[in-house]
């Protein structure tokens, strides 16, 4: 695009592992996520009690990391290589964000299978934005983002194809 204010960019990448239980299994997932991303991990807690899964309210059941800037770019490059640079159009939401899953953490470079730890999968969510989105986040003179300035699905697909060579089926 010729106008730099219309060019989409990556705001953040969220990597999430839903383990479903606390204890050593969750600690192993946190260590794997910290190794893969090189960043501190935050725990996710259950919102309500689910007796069928023996989950109590406020029990830690997952972990996540939010990546921004250069780390997000590097992680996305590796992640798209793992999923062979193919996405489905159904993986995009109406705001141009995209989510996809990685089935095994052992697909990442430098990660090997350890029978004591097991295999973990993860969810990756990419949030895209355009320059000028600060107007909806600032404290003074907050405004809505105009409809024509929001990132659409087609804009997101074009950006990912151009920047990372991702094909959308």
Curated annotation (Swiss-Prot):
Keywords: Ribonucleoprotein, Ribosomal protein, RNA-binding, rRNA-binding, tRNA-binding. This is Large ribosomal subunit protein uL5. GO terms for cellular component: ribonucleoprotein complex; ribosome. The keyword Ribonucleoprotein applies. It comes from Methanosarcina mazei (strain ATCC BAA-159 / DSM 3647 / Goe1 / Go1 / JCM 11833 / OCM 88) (Methanosarcina frisia). It comes from the Archaea. The keyword Ribosomal protein applies. This is one of the proteins that bind and probably mediate the attachment of the 5S RNA into the large ribosomal subunit, where it forms part of the central protuberance. In the 70S ribosome it contacts protein S13 of the 30S subunit (bridge B1b), connecting the 2 subunits; this bridge is implicated in subunit movement. May contact the P site tRNA; the 5S rRNA and some of its associated proteins might help stabilize positioning of ribosome-bound tRNAs. The lineage of its organism: Archaea, Methanobacteriati, Methanobacteriota, Stenosarchaea group, Methanomicrobia. Transmembrane segments: none annotated. One of its GO terms (biological process) is translation. The gene is rpl5. Part of the 50S ribosomal subunit; contacts the 5S rRNA and probably tRNA. Forms a bridge to the 30S subunit in the 70S ribosome. Belongs to the universal ribosomal protein uL5 family. One of its GO terms (molecular function) is structural constituent of ribosome. Pfam families: Ribosomal_L5, Ribosomal_L5_C. PROSITE patterns: RIBOSOMAL_L5 (PS00358). InterPro entries: Ribosomal_uL5, Ribosomal_uL5_arc, Ribosomal_uL5_C, Ribosomal_uL5_CS, Ribosomal_uL5_dom_sf, Ribosomal_uL5_N.
């Amino acid at each position: 695009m010729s106008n730099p204010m219309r060019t989409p960019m990556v705001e953040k990448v969220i990597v999430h592992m839903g383990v479903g239980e606390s204890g050593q299994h969750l600690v192993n997932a946190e260590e794997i996520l910290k190794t893969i991303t090189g960043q501190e991990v935050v725990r996710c807690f259950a919102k309500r009690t689910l007796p069928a899964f023996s989950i109590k309210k406020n029990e830690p059941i997952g972990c996540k990391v939010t990546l921004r800037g250069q780390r997000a770019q590097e992680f996305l490059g590796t992640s798209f290589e793992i999923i062979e640079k193919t996405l489905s159009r159904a993986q995009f939401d109406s705001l141009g964000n995209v989510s996809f899953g990685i089935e095994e953490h052992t697909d990442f470079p430098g990660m090997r299978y350890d029978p004591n730890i097991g295999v973990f999968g993860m969810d990756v969510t990419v949030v895209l934005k355009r320059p000028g989105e600060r107007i909806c986040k600032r404290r003074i003179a907050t405004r809505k983002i105009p409809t024509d300035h929001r990132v659409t699905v087609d804009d997101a697909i074009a950006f990912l194809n151009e920047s990372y060579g991702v094909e959308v089926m």
